[in-house]
Protein backbone atom coordinates (compact mmCIF):
# COMPACT_ATOMS: atom_id res chain seq x y z
CA UNK A 1 0.00 0.00 0.00
CA UNK A 2 1.12 3.58 -0.64
CA UNK A 3 2.45 5.62 2.25
CA UNK A 4 0.24 8.43 3.52
CA UNK A 5 1.35 11.81 4.87
CA UNK A 6 0.32 12.35 8.47
CA UNK A 7 -0.47 16.01 9.14
CA UNK A 8 -0.36 17.05 12.79
CA UNK A 9 -2.86 19.79 13.64
CA UNK A 10 -3.19 22.33 16.39
CA UNK A 11 -6.52 22.52 18.23
CA UNK A 12 -7.75 25.17 15.83
CA UNK A 13 -7.13 22.91 12.85
CA UNK A 14 -4.12 24.81 11.49
CA UNK A 15 -1.21 22.69 10.28
CA UNK A 16 1.61 22.32 12.77
CA UNK A 17 3.95 19.85 11.11
CA UNK A 18 4.11 16.54 9.34
CA UNK A 19 5.49 13.05 9.78
CA UNK A 20 5.25 9.74 7.95
CA UNK A 21 3.35 6.95 9.66
CA UNK A 22 2.19 3.48 8.78
CA UNK A 23 0.41 2.79 5.54
CA UNK A 24 -3.21 3.26 6.50
CA UNK A 25 -3.56 5.89 9.18
CA UNK A 26 -4.13 9.64 8.88
CA UNK A 27 -4.29 12.02 11.82
CA UNK A 28 -6.08 15.38 11.79
CA UNK A 29 -6.08 15.69 8.03
CA UNK A 30 -8.20 18.74 7.09
CA UNK A 31 -9.10 17.44 3.65
CA UNK A 32 -10.43 14.26 5.20
CA UNK A 33 -13.53 15.84 6.73
CA UNK A 34 -16.77 14.33 5.50
CA UNK A 35 -18.14 11.05 4.31
CA UNK A 36 -15.52 8.55 3.18
CA UNK A 37 -15.47 5.57 0.83
CA UNK A 38 -15.95 2.03 2.07
CA UNK A 39 -12.20 1.56 2.64
CA UNK A 40 -11.92 4.60 4.91
CA UNK A 41 -13.03 4.81 8.52
CA UNK A 42 -13.08 8.24 10.12
CA UNK A 43 -13.43 9.03 13.81
CA UNK A 44 -13.59 12.30 15.71
CA UNK A 45 -13.03 12.95 19.39
CA UNK A 46 -11.56 15.46 21.86
CA UNK A 47 -8.17 13.77 22.10
CA UNK A 48 -6.02 16.50 20.62
CA UNK A 49 -2.97 16.56 22.89
CA UNK A 50 -0.48 14.00 24.19
CA UNK A 51 -0.40 11.58 25.85
CA UNK A 52 -4.07 10.85 25.07
CA UNK A 53 -3.77 11.70 21.39
CA UNK A 54 -0.73 9.44 20.94
CA UNK A 55 -2.52 6.56 22.65
CA UNK A 56 -5.64 6.74 20.50
CA UNK A 57 -3.67 7.20 17.28
CA UNK A 58 -1.47 4.19 18.05
CA UNK A 59 -4.61 2.12 18.62
CA UNK A 60 -6.09 3.41 15.36
CA UNK A 61 -2.90 2.63 13.45
CA UNK A 62 -2.91 -0.92 14.81
CA UNK A 63 -6.57 -1.31 13.89
CA UNK A 64 -5.86 -0.20 10.33
CA UNK A 65 -3.01 -2.71 10.06
CA UNK A 66 -5.28 -5.47 11.33
CA UNK A 67 -7.88 -4.74 8.65
CA UNK A 68 -6.09 -5.03 5.33
CA UNK A 69 -6.63 -2.12 2.97
CA UNK A 70 -8.51 -0.02 5.50
CA UNK A 71 -7.53 3.62 6.02
CA UNK A 72 -8.36 5.05 9.44
CA UNK A 73 -8.50 8.81 9.86
CA UNK A 74 -8.56 10.56 13.23
CA UNK A 75 -9.37 14.15 14.06
CA UNK A 76 -9.13 15.63 17.55
CA UNK A 77 -11.23 18.70 18.32
CA UNK A 78 -11.89 20.92 21.28
CA UNK A 79 -15.11 19.95 23.02
CA UNK A 80 -16.81 23.16 21.92
CA UNK A 81 -15.82 22.67 18.28
CA UNK A 82 -16.94 19.06 18.26
CA UNK A 83 -20.31 19.81 19.83
CA UNK A 84 -20.98 22.63 17.37
CA UNK A 85 -19.79 20.77 14.28
CA UNK A 86 -20.87 17.16 14.68
CA UNK A 87 -24.69 17.45 14.44
CA UNK A 88 -24.46 19.73 11.41
CA UNK A 89 -22.09 17.56 9.41
CA UNK A 90 -23.95 14.35 10.22
CA UNK A 91 -27.16 16.03 9.12
CA UNK A 92 -25.54 16.84 5.76
CA UNK A 93 -24.12 13.29 5.46
CA UNK A 94 -20.56 14.59 5.77
CA UNK A 95 -19.83 13.31 9.26
CA UNK A 96 -17.44 10.69 10.62
CA UNK A 97 -18.26 7.03 11.12
CA UNK A 98 -17.47 7.18 14.84
CA UNK A 99 -17.43 10.18 17.17
CA UNK A 100 -17.35 11.08 20.81
CA UNK A 101 -20.85 12.35 21.61
CA UNK A 102 -21.10 14.29 24.84
CA UNK A 103 -23.40 12.79 27.44
CA UNK A 104 -26.92 13.81 28.26
CA UNK A 105 -28.84 16.68 26.78
CA UNK A 106 -25.62 18.47 25.89
CA UNK A 107 -25.48 16.38 22.69
CA UNK A 108 -26.41 12.70 22.94
CA UNK A 109 -30.13 13.15 23.55
CA UNK A 110 -30.66 15.66 20.72
CA UNK A 111 -28.68 13.51 18.27
CA UNK A 112 -30.68 10.37 19.12
CA UNK A 113 -33.95 12.24 18.64
CA UNK A 114 -32.68 13.60 15.33
CA UNK A 115 -31.93 10.07 14.12
CA UNK A 116 -28.19 10.76 13.87
CA UNK A 117 -26.88 7.87 15.99
CA UNK A 118 -26.93 4.13 15.34
CA UNK A 119 -28.54 1.79 17.86
CA UNK A 120 -25.57 -0.20 19.22
CA UNK A 121 -27.54 -2.72 21.31
CA UNK A 122 -26.35 -5.73 19.32
CA UNK A 123 -22.72 -4.63 19.61
CA UNK A 124 -23.04 -4.07 23.36
CA UNK A 125 -23.99 -7.72 23.69
CA UNK A 126 -21.44 -8.97 21.15
CA UNK A 127 -18.47 -7.17 22.71
CA UNK A 128 -19.58 -7.16 26.35
CA UNK A 129 -19.40 -3.39 26.66
CA UNK A 130 -21.78 -3.30 29.62
CA UNK A 131 -19.55 -5.55 31.72
CA UNK A 132 -17.19 -4.29 34.40
CA UNK A 133 -18.86 -0.96 35.24
CA UNK A 134 -21.49 -0.33 37.91
CA UNK A 135 -25.00 0.53 36.74
CA UNK A 136 -24.65 4.10 38.01
CA UNK A 137 -21.78 4.75 35.61
CA UNK A 138 -23.36 2.94 32.67
CA UNK A 139 -26.47 5.09 33.08
CA UNK A 140 -24.51 8.16 31.96
CA UNK A 141 -24.30 6.71 28.44
CA UNK A 142 -27.89 5.44 28.38
CA UNK A 143 -31.07 6.76 26.81
CA UNK A 144 -34.44 5.33 25.97
CA UNK A 145 -34.84 4.12 22.38
CA UNK A 146 -36.55 7.37 21.36
CA UNK A 147 -33.95 9.57 23.08
CA UNK A 148 -36.40 11.19 25.48
CA UNK A 149 -35.29 9.62 28.79
CA UNK A 150 -31.71 10.06 29.99
CA UNK A 151 -30.07 7.58 32.34
CA UNK A 152 -32.24 4.60 31.46
CA UNK A 153 -32.91 2.27 28.55
CA UNK A 154 -29.94 1.23 26.42
CA UNK A 155 -26.33 2.21 25.85
CA UNK A 156 -25.79 4.58 22.93
CA UNK A 157 -22.06 5.05 23.40
CA UNK A 158 -19.04 3.51 25.11
CA UNK A 159 -16.37 5.34 27.09
CA UNK A 160 -12.68 4.48 27.06
CA UNK A 161 -11.85 6.72 29.98
CA UNK A 162 -13.32 7.64 33.31
CA UNK A 163 -13.32 11.17 34.64
CA UNK A 164 -13.21 12.74 38.04
CA UNK A 165 -12.48 16.36 38.87
CA UNK A 166 -10.43 17.15 41.94
CA UNK A 167 -7.50 19.16 43.20
CA UNK A 168 -3.95 18.65 42.00
CA UNK A 169 -1.41 20.08 44.41
CA UNK A 170 2.27 20.95 44.42
CA UNK A 171 3.83 18.85 47.19
CA UNK A 172 6.83 21.16 47.58
CA UNK A 173 4.67 24.25 48.10
CA UNK A 174 2.49 22.44 50.62
CA UNK A 175 5.59 21.36 52.53
CA UNK A 176 7.18 24.81 52.34
CA UNK A 177 4.08 26.55 53.72
CA UNK A 178 3.40 23.76 56.21
CA UNK A 179 -0.07 22.72 55.08
CA UNK A 180 -1.55 19.27 54.62
CA UNK A 181 -4.27 17.78 52.47
CA UNK A 182 -7.54 19.05 54.03
CA UNK A 183 -10.31 16.77 55.27
CA UNK A 184 -13.23 19.26 55.28
CA UNK A 185 -14.30 22.18 53.11
CA UNK A 186 -13.55 24.58 55.96
CA UNK A 187 -10.07 23.06 56.21
CA UNK A 188 -9.61 23.60 52.48
CA UNK A 189 -10.47 27.27 52.85
CA UNK A 190 -8.06 27.53 55.78
CA UNK A 191 -5.34 26.04 53.57
CA UNK A 192 -6.23 28.57 50.86
CA UNK A 193 -5.78 31.39 53.35
CA UNK A 194 -2.46 30.07 54.69
CA UNK A 195 -1.12 29.79 51.16
CA UNK A 196 -2.34 33.28 50.32
CA UNK A 197 -0.72 34.70 53.46
CA UNK A 198 2.54 33.00 52.44
CA UNK A 199 2.49 34.76 49.06
CA UNK A 200 1.31 31.76 47.06
CA UNK A 201 -1.58 31.54 44.60
CA UNK A 202 -3.89 29.08 46.36
CA UNK A 203 -5.90 27.94 43.33
CA UNK A 204 -4.67 28.25 39.75
CA UNK A 205 -7.82 28.79 37.72
CA UNK A 206 -8.60 30.10 34.26
CA UNK A 207 -12.13 30.59 33.00
CA UNK A 208 -11.68 32.10 29.56
CA UNK A 209 -13.11 28.89 28.07
CA UNK A 210 -16.07 28.84 30.45
CA UNK A 211 -16.26 25.12 31.20
CA UNK A 212 -13.79 25.17 34.09
CA UNK A 213 -16.30 27.13 36.18
CA UNK A 214 -18.80 24.28 35.77
CA UNK A 215 -16.29 22.02 37.49
CA UNK A 216 -15.39 24.49 40.23
CA UNK A 217 -19.00 25.30 41.04
CA UNK A 218 -20.05 21.68 40.63
CA UNK A 219 -17.56 20.41 43.18
CA UNK A 220 -18.55 23.03 45.74
CA UNK A 221 -22.18 22.13 45.11
CA UNK A 222 -21.29 18.46 45.43
CA UNK A 223 -20.50 19.00 49.11
CA UNK A 224 -23.99 20.40 49.72
CA UNK A 225 -26.33 18.22 47.67
CA UNK A 226 -27.79 14.72 47.62
CA UNK A 227 -27.84 11.86 45.13
CA UNK A 228 -31.62 12.21 44.78
CA UNK A 229 -31.39 15.88 43.89
CA UNK A 230 -28.45 15.67 41.50
CA UNK A 231 -29.72 12.60 39.64
CA UNK A 232 -33.15 14.18 39.43
CA UNK A 233 -31.92 17.43 37.92
CA UNK A 234 -29.59 15.78 35.39
CA UNK A 235 -31.80 12.82 34.47
CA UNK A 236 -34.71 15.27 34.14
CA UNK A 237 -37.30 13.63 36.36
CA UNK A 238 -39.11 16.96 36.51
CA UNK A 239 -39.13 16.86 40.30
CA UNK A 240 -36.12 19.10 40.99
CA UNK A 241 -35.43 22.80 40.54
CA UNK A 242 -32.25 24.82 40.19
CA UNK A 243 -33.75 27.24 42.70
CA UNK A 244 -32.65 24.83 45.39
CA UNK A 245 -30.92 26.05 48.53
CA UNK A 246 -27.88 23.91 47.72
CA UNK A 247 -27.40 25.78 44.42
CA UNK A 248 -27.75 29.16 46.12
CA UNK A 249 -25.37 28.22 48.95
CA UNK A 250 -22.75 26.86 46.54
CA UNK A 251 -22.97 30.02 44.44
CA UNK A 252 -22.47 32.17 47.53
CA UNK A 253 -19.48 30.09 48.59
CA UNK A 254 -17.90 30.45 45.15
CA UNK A 255 -18.33 34.22 45.21
CA UNK A 256 -16.67 34.24 48.63
CA UNK A 257 -13.66 32.41 47.22
CA UNK A 258 -13.32 35.10 44.58
CA UNK A 259 -13.64 37.99 47.03
CA UNK A 260 -11.12 36.35 49.38
CA UNK A 261 -8.54 36.22 46.59
CA UNK A 262 -8.24 32.44 46.52
CA UNK A 263 -8.35 32.22 42.71
CA UNK A 264 -5.57 33.18 40.32
CA UNK A 265 -5.62 36.90 39.64
CA UNK A 266 -6.98 37.70 36.18
CA UNK A 267 -8.62 34.28 35.82
CA UNK A 268 -11.31 35.73 33.55
CA UNK A 269 -8.79 36.15 30.73
CA UNK A 270 -6.81 32.94 31.22
CA UNK A 271 -7.65 29.75 29.33
CA UNK A 272 -7.82 26.32 30.90
CA UNK A 273 -4.72 25.12 29.04
CA UNK A 274 -2.74 28.18 30.10
CA UNK A 275 -3.80 27.75 33.72
CA UNK A 276 -2.71 24.12 33.62
CA UNK A 277 0.61 25.13 32.06
CA UNK A 278 1.23 27.62 34.88
CA UNK A 279 0.62 24.95 37.50
CA UNK A 280 2.75 22.43 35.63
CA UNK A 281 5.57 24.98 35.57
CA UNK A 282 5.47 25.20 39.38
CA UNK A 283 3.37 28.35 39.71
CA UNK A 284 0.56 28.06 42.24
CA UNK A 285 -0.29 25.54 44.93
CA UNK A 286 -3.38 23.83 43.52
CA UNK A 287 -5.25 23.30 40.26
CA UNK A 288 -8.84 22.07 40.10
CA UNK A 289 -8.96 19.99 36.96
CA UNK A 290 -10.07 16.62 35.67
CA UNK A 291 -8.26 13.30 35.67
CA UNK A 292 -7.49 13.80 31.97
CA UNK A 293 -4.84 16.36 32.99
CA UNK A 294 -2.87 13.85 35.09
CA UNK A 295 -0.59 12.66 32.30
CA UNK A 296 0.52 16.17 31.41
CA UNK A 297 1.00 17.17 35.04
CA UNK A 298 3.03 14.04 35.75
CA UNK A 299 5.20 14.66 32.72
CA UNK A 300 5.81 18.36 33.35
CA UNK A 301 5.63 19.00 37.10
CA UNK A 302 6.60 15.43 37.95
CA UNK A 303 4.79 12.29 39.06
CA UNK A 304 6.38 12.56 42.51
CA UNK A 305 6.15 16.36 42.73
CA UNK A 306 2.37 16.52 42.32
CA UNK A 307 -0.45 14.96 44.29
CA UNK A 308 -4.20 14.71 43.92
CA UNK A 309 -7.14 14.79 46.31
CA UNK A 310 -10.89 15.11 45.98
CA UNK A 311 -12.92 18.06 47.20
CA UNK A 312 -13.39 17.40 50.92
CA UNK A 313 -16.85 17.22 52.54
CA UNK A 314 -18.55 19.84 54.69
CA UNK A 315 -17.98 17.63 57.71
CA UNK A 316 -15.23 15.07 58.18
CA UNK A 317 -16.40 11.67 57.02
CA UNK A 318 -19.26 13.13 55.01
CA UNK A 319 -20.06 12.36 51.39
CA UNK A 320 -19.38 14.52 48.35
CA UNK A 321 -20.77 14.02 44.85
CA UNK A 322 -17.70 14.79 42.77
CA UNK A 323 -17.93 16.16 39.25
CA UNK A 324 -17.11 13.30 36.91
CA UNK A 325 -18.22 9.92 35.71
CA UNK A 326 -17.26 8.26 32.47
CA UNK A 327 -15.44 10.01 29.68
CA UNK A 328 -17.23 11.26 26.59
CA UNK A 329 -18.47 8.07 24.90
CA UNK A 330 -17.75 6.89 21.39
CA UNK A 331 -20.90 6.39 19.31
CA UNK A 332 -21.63 5.35 15.73
CA UNK A 333 -23.20 8.01 13.53
CA UNK A 334 -25.74 7.29 10.83
CA UNK A 335 -23.11 8.42 8.30
CA UNK A 336 -21.14 5.23 8.98
CA UNK A 337 -20.56 3.29 5.76
CA UNK A 338 -20.06 0.02 7.67
CA UNK A 339 -21.51 0.09 11.22
CA UNK A 340 -19.99 -3.33 11.97
CA UNK A 341 -16.51 -2.02 11.22
CA UNK A 342 -17.22 1.15 13.18
CA UNK A 343 -18.21 -0.97 16.18
CA UNK A 344 -15.00 -2.98 15.85
CA UNK A 345 -13.01 0.27 15.97
CA UNK A 346 -14.82 1.34 19.12
CA UNK A 347 -14.03 -2.04 20.64
CA UNK A 348 -10.35 -1.41 19.90
CA UNK A 349 -10.54 2.02 21.56
CA UNK A 350 -12.03 0.53 24.75
CA UNK A 351 -9.99 -2.69 24.78
CA UNK A 352 -7.73 -4.10 27.48
CA UNK A 353 -4.87 -2.82 25.35
CA UNK A 354 -6.30 0.70 25.58
CA UNK A 355 -6.87 0.29 29.34
CA UNK A 356 -3.23 -0.69 29.87
CA UNK A 357 -1.95 2.20 27.74
CA UNK A 358 -3.99 4.70 29.75
CA UNK A 359 -2.68 3.32 33.04
CA UNK A 360 0.88 3.37 31.69
CA UNK A 361 0.43 7.07 30.91
CA UNK A 362 -0.99 7.82 34.36
CA UNK A 363 -4.46 8.43 32.95
CA UNK A 364 -7.78 7.07 34.19
CA UNK A 365 -9.44 4.29 32.17
CA UNK A 366 -13.09 3.37 32.63
CA UNK A 367 -13.22 0.76 35.38
CA UNK A 368 -11.71 0.11 38.79
CA UNK A 369 -7.93 0.12 39.03
CA UNK A 370 -6.36 -3.02 40.50
CA UNK A 371 -4.53 -2.49 43.78
CA UNK A 372 -1.27 -3.80 42.34
CA UNK A 373 -1.34 -0.97 39.79
CA UNK A 374 -1.51 1.73 42.46
CA UNK A 375 1.79 3.20 43.68
CA UNK A 376 1.34 5.15 46.93
CA UNK A 377 2.58 8.74 47.27
CA UNK A 378 2.59 9.35 43.53
CA UNK A 379 0.23 11.37 41.39
CA UNK A 380 -1.26 8.33 39.68
CA UNK A 381 -1.51 6.51 43.01
CA UNK A 382 -3.46 9.39 44.53
CA UNK A 383 -5.72 9.61 41.48
CA UNK A 384 -6.45 5.89 41.25
CA UNK A 385 -7.12 5.58 44.97
CA UNK A 386 -9.48 8.56 44.84
CA UNK A 387 -11.30 7.13 41.82
CA UNK A 388 -11.73 3.66 43.34
CA UNK A 389 -13.03 5.23 46.55
CA UNK A 390 -15.54 7.37 44.65
CA UNK A 391 -16.81 4.37 42.66
CA UNK A 392 -17.15 2.16 45.73
CA UNK A 393 -18.93 4.88 47.73
CA UNK A 394 -21.26 5.96 44.91
CA UNK A 395 -19.70 9.42 45.13
CA UNK A 396 -19.61 10.37 41.46
CA UNK A 397 -21.81 13.27 40.54
CA UNK A 398 -22.52 14.73 37.12
CA UNK A 399 -21.65 17.60 34.83
CA UNK A 400 -24.47 20.10 35.23
CA UNK A 401 -24.38 21.10 31.56
CA UNK A 402 -25.93 17.69 30.76
CA UNK A 403 -29.23 18.89 32.22
CA UNK A 404 -30.87 20.44 29.13
CA UNK A 405 -30.24 21.07 25.44
CA UNK A 406 -28.21 24.26 25.09
CA UNK A 407 -27.63 24.42 28.85
CA UNK A 408 -23.85 24.48 28.42
CA UNK A 409 -23.93 27.97 26.91
CA UNK A 410 -26.35 29.23 29.54
CA UNK A 411 -24.53 27.90 32.60
CA UNK A 412 -21.08 29.00 31.43
CA UNK A 413 -22.42 32.50 30.81
CA UNK A 414 -24.20 32.66 34.16
CA UNK A 415 -21.14 31.36 36.00
CA UNK A 416 -19.02 34.07 34.40
CA UNK A 417 -21.52 36.62 35.67
CA UNK A 418 -21.54 35.01 39.11
CA UNK A 419 -17.74 35.05 39.30
CA UNK A 420 -17.78 38.70 38.22
CA UNK A 421 -20.31 39.54 40.95
CA UNK A 422 -22.80 40.66 38.30
CA UNK A 423 -25.60 38.48 39.70
CA UNK A 424 -26.52 37.38 43.20
CA UNK A 425 -26.61 33.68 44.07
CA UNK A 426 -30.41 33.88 44.06
CA UNK A 427 -30.49 35.50 40.61
CA UNK A 428 -28.02 32.92 39.33
CA UNK A 429 -30.23 30.06 40.50
CA UNK A 430 -33.37 31.70 39.09
CA UNK A 431 -31.77 32.21 35.68
CA UNK A 432 -30.72 28.56 35.52
CA UNK A 433 -34.18 27.41 36.53
CA UNK A 434 -35.95 29.61 33.97
CA UNK A 435 -33.96 28.02 31.13
CA UNK A 436 -34.25 24.53 32.59
CA UNK A 437 -38.02 24.76 33.05
CA UNK A 438 -38.45 25.98 29.47
CA UNK A 439 -36.63 22.88 28.21
CA UNK A 440 -39.58 20.73 29.33
CA UNK A 441 -42.11 22.71 27.29
Segments from the language model and where they lie:
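Short helix-initiation/N-cap motifs at beta->coil->alpha
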Residues: 76-85, 185-190, 266-280
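Extracytoplasmic/periplasmic solute-binding protein
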Residues: 146-160, 165, 189-239, 284
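C-terminal capping/gating helix-and-loop segments adjacent to ligand/active sites or protein-protein/ligand interfaces
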Residues: 235-236, 323-324, 361-371, 382-440
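Short, solvent-exposed loop/beta-turn-alpha elements that line the ligand-binding surface or hinge
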Residues: 121-136, 224-249, 299-301, 313-321, ...
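Hinge/lid segment of periplasmic solute-binding proteins
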Residues: 105-165, 216, 307
Amino acid sequence: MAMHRRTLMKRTGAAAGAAVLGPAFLANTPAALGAQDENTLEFWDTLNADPRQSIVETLAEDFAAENGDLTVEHRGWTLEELQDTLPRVVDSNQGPDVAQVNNGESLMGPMIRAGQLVDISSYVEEYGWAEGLPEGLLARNMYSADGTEFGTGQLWGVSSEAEIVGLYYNRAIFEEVGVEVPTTLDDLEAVFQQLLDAGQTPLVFGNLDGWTAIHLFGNIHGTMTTREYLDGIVYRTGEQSFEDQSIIDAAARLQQWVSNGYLLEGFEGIGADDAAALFEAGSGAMLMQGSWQAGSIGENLGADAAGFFLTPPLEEGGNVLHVGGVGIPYAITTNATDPDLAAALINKLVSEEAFAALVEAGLLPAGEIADDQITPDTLSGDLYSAWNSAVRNDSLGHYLDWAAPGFYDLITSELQRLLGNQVTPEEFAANLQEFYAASFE
